[in-house]
Amino acid sequence: PKKDTSGTITYTTGRLAKPLDFFAYFLADRPNAYTETLLPVEVGGRTLDIALRSWPDDPAWAKQVGGVLAKGLPVLSDSIGLPWLDPGQLVVAEAISRSTGGYSGRYDPEVGRIEVAYYASPRVVLHEAAHAWFDGRLLAERWANEGFASFYGDQAAAALKFKVARPSLTSKQAANRVPLNGWGPAPGTDVAVDEYGYVASAEVARAIAERAGPAGLASVWQAARNGVAAYQPPGLGESNGAVGSGSDVGAVESGAAPPDWRGLLDLLEDRTGRTYGDIWRTWVIRPEEASLLDERLAARRLYDDVVRRAGEWQLPPVIRQAMRAWQFEQATALLTAADHLLDDRAAVEAAAETAQLELPRAMRAAFEGQASFAAAAAEADAELQTIAAYRAAAALQPAAPDIVLEVGLWGATPDADLAQAAAAFSSGDLRASVEASARAQVAWAGAAELGRNRLMTILGATIASLIAVGFIVGRFRSMRRRLARRAEARAYARSVRTLATREAVRSRAMAHPIDQDPRPRGRR
């Protein structure tokens, strides 16, 4: 370029070998020369004041673009299923196209500004307006944002009866095919690749939308907006509209970054219950990434099987993290270990059911926690041993104890010990359960022998007591006989003395008859 004294700039070329192939164009504008008009638009229950900035000599542009936005933004919000996300003011400015093949519009999410060419069609306006949602903060990659901005823009245009021509992929554009996950950021340096990328990404978005359905896509966007990745723990169910791998599963794990091509595939399949691997293989991935999709498919099948088998139990977070990061070798190893632990759980459940014991929560807590599976395996072994101790004690419990067992159990409370063992097991105090079971087992196991010993002791004591009583009674009776004989002897002696006295008196009487009484008669 050459500039003369008047300020005129002249561009010249040298001799052209192929002058018919030569093409040049010039762009110029005055970015600060705008007339601003505020346009209030109701979007998702919120009133937006859109700043329309048109060139002073082109009021028709503001009228046309403002009319499209006033009608289109509410339709876009309803179709996408999200409210207006940008807290700031939306600025829509008239501009010129700065490329020969790119779109005649551009959206800058950093400042909330849309530039729309002075000649742009309603389709372009709606496409750029859709970028207010698909601006890199909802989805991470260019192809996804461009594709769904085109899809929803075209959908809104059709709903509003705008006549728009939807471009289809030409063979010339297809010749510049690149994997969409390798399509670089805008603005691209290769115009032909960009042309392919815009059209191909729109084709992919339409294919995805046809398979997912409006409600399925809305669920994906809601999850992406809230930072909710795929592979959520069980228990969320209908509240998140989730189906598929791990989605009928406690607390939402949020904080995920906007999904890239991998996270988007996971979210789509998780939220819609459909598969999209064929679309990804055809349009999105590099050839060397095809094996990664195969690994993913096998890992997801195993994941679904283990989640289904786990039931109400949640898989530990480390498994879900490995699946989200596409670390499928690590995820497969962890899932296999989890499956083995579920075998242990089944063994513990069967043993507890047989023993009529309520399972503690310790194994589940260890399984679902951040620790390694070794803690859960150790807990399973400990619970099995505790149940075995309980069953060993319960097996000795007599249905109807006889007198020998009853005597042997004097002072022992094995029934209470067994009940204590069951309660301690259910509360997770395995040591106390084993100790209580041991007390019950020892009491019942030794009751018969102890009862016999006690009865023999009682019998011996009884016999000794009877002998002592017999001896005492014999002695008493012997003493009574001796006393009786003595009393009889004394009575006999008294009788003899009495008889002797009587005989003596009689003898004296006979020796002195009354007629021979020497005393004078008058003194009688």
Residue ranges: model-predicted function:
Residues 480-524:
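Cytoplasmic C-terminal tails of single-pass
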Residues 1-32:
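Extended, low-hydrophobicity, Ser/Thr/Pro/Gly-biased non-transmembrane segments
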Residues 435-457:
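Short, aromatic-rich amphipathic segments at membrane interfaces
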Residues 1, 192, 230-438, 459-463, ...:
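Beta/coil-rich, acidic/histidine-enriched accessory regions frequently appended to metallopeptidases
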Residues 35-137, 141:
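Juxtacatalytic substrate-recognition/specificity segment
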Residues 119, 142-214, 218-257, 304:
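Acidic/His/Gly-enriched intrinsically disordered linker/tail segments
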Residues 454-477:
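Selective detector of the "anchor" transmembrane alpha-helix that sits immediately C-terminal
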Residues 59-71, 119-120, 124, 139, ...:
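Soluble non-cytosolic domains of exported or imported proteins
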